[in-house]
């Protein structure tokens, strides 16, 4: 039970004290880190690769630029950005969770992604970088786990260079009603079973489904980005809104 005097937030469908959420999310990702890539393929039927490819294509990243892959996990986007920025550029893979960061580092080194990638354990709400550092920031399937999303968006805005852009790839709200119902059935009944069988962790994947439902919808997130200072904010619905890619600029 959370005392009324405490500031609260949501952890899935639970109401928890704000200071508790980060530890609870950390526990989830410590638990799932070793099976993260396998579960991504199973949960999305491999479609997450297309969503990430679209994000890369919309990034405008060029040779010599500096990119922050925030909540970068096992490094899918970092691997692509590393090739795009080349030897004269740099990619920082940042994640608040050390288990996920370790998995990302091992995976990328095993496939030969070295030299222009750095690894930083960082909280999105208080990024440890100077103002105006990055040409591009991406956060892929990570924003919904952040306790204070508005604070994180302001932090991202601060470390972007003028002319830089933020891309937020995140689960969103399906725009077709029959799909929405089928998606709910899959998320709440099938997904935890897959998590139990493959990762021996139904609870973490039940949290995943709940956290998606609690995440702001497309237009709400667009407004939040605008409030944080981003301009020319737009979004693309992917797979009929199951996922949305938001993009905003710092001018």
Curated annotation (Swiss-Prot):
Gene3D superfamilies in the cross-refs: Vaccinia Virus protein VP39
InterPro entries tied to this protein: SAM-dependent_MTases_sf, UbiE/COQ5_MeTrFase, UbiE/COQ5_MeTrFase_CS
GO molecular function, one term: demethylmenaquinone methyltransferase activity
Entry keywords, A to Z: Menaquinone biosynthesis, Methyltransferase, S-adenosyl-L-methionine, Transferase, Ubiquinone biosynthesis
Signal peptide: none
Protein name (record): Ubiquinone/menaquinone biosynthesis C-methyltransferase UbiE
EC number: 2.1.1.163, 2.1.1.201
Pfam families attached to this UniProt entry: Ubie_methyltran (PF01209)
Broadest EC class assigned to this enzyme: transferase
Binding residues for S-adenosyl-L-methionine: 74, 95, 123-124, 140
Pathway field: Quinol/quinone metabolism; menaquinone biosynthesis; menaquinol from 1,4-dihydroxy-2-naphthoate: step 2/2; Cofactor biosynthesis; ubiquinone biosynthesis
Catalytic reactions on record: a 2-demethylmenaquinol + S-adenosyl-L-methionine = a menaquinol + S-adenosyl-L-homocysteine + H(+); a 2-methoxy-6-(all-trans-polyprenyl)benzene-1,4-diol + S-adenosyl-L-methionine = a 5-methoxy-2-methyl-3-(all-trans-polyprenyl)benzene-1,4-diol + S-adenosyl-L-homocysteine + H(+)
Function: Methyltransferase required for the conversion of demethylmenaquinol (DMKH2) to menaquinol (MKH2) and the conversion of 2-polyprenyl-6-methoxy-1,4-benzoquinol (DDMQH2) to 2-polyprenyl-3-methyl-6-methoxy-1,4-benzoquinol (DMQH2).
Higher taxonomy: Bacteria, Pseudomonadati, Pseudomonadota, Gammaproteobacteria, Enterobacterales
Coiled-coil stretches noted in the UniProt entry, renumbered to this chain: none
GO biological process: aerobic respiration; menaquinone biosynthetic process; methylation; ubiquinone biosynthetic process
PANTHER family according to UniProt: 2-METHOXY-6-POLYPRENYL-1,4-BENZOQUINOL METHYLASE, MITOCHONDRIAL, METHYLTRANSFERASE
Family: Belongs to the class I-like SAM-binding methyltransferase superfamily. MenG/UbiE family.
């Amino acid at each position: 039970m959370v005392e009324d005097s405490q500031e609260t937030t949501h952890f899935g469908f639970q109401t928890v004290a704000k200071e508790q959420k980060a530890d609870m999310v950390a526990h989830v990702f410590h638990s799932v880190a070793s099976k993260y890539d396998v579960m991504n393929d199973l949960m999305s039927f491999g479609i997450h690769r297309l969503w990430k490819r679209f994000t890369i294509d919309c990034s405008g990243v060029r040779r010599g630029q500096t990119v922050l892959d925030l909540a970068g996990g096992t490094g899918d986007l970092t691997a692509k950005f590393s090739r795009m920025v080349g030897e004269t550029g740099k990619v920082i893979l940042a994640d608040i969770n050390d288990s996920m960061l370790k998995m990302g580092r091992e995976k990328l080194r095993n496939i030969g992604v070295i030299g222009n990638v750095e690894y930083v354990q960082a909280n999105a709400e208080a990024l440890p970088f100077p103002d105006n550092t990055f040409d591009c920031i991406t956060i892929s399937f990570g924003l919904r786990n952040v306790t204070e999303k508005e604070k994180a968006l302001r932090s991202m805005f601060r470390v972007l260079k003028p002319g830089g852009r933020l891309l937020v790839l995140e689960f969103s709200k399906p725009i077709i009603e029959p799909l929405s119902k089928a998606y709910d059935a899959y998320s709440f009944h099938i997904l935890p079973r897959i998590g139990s069988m493959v990762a021996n962790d139904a609870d973490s994947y039940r949290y995943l489904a709940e956290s998606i439902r609690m995440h702001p919808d497309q237009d709400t997130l667009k407004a939040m980005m605008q409030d944080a200072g981003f301009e020319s904010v737009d979004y693309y619905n992917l797979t009929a809104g199951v996922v949305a890619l938001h993009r905003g600029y710092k001018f």
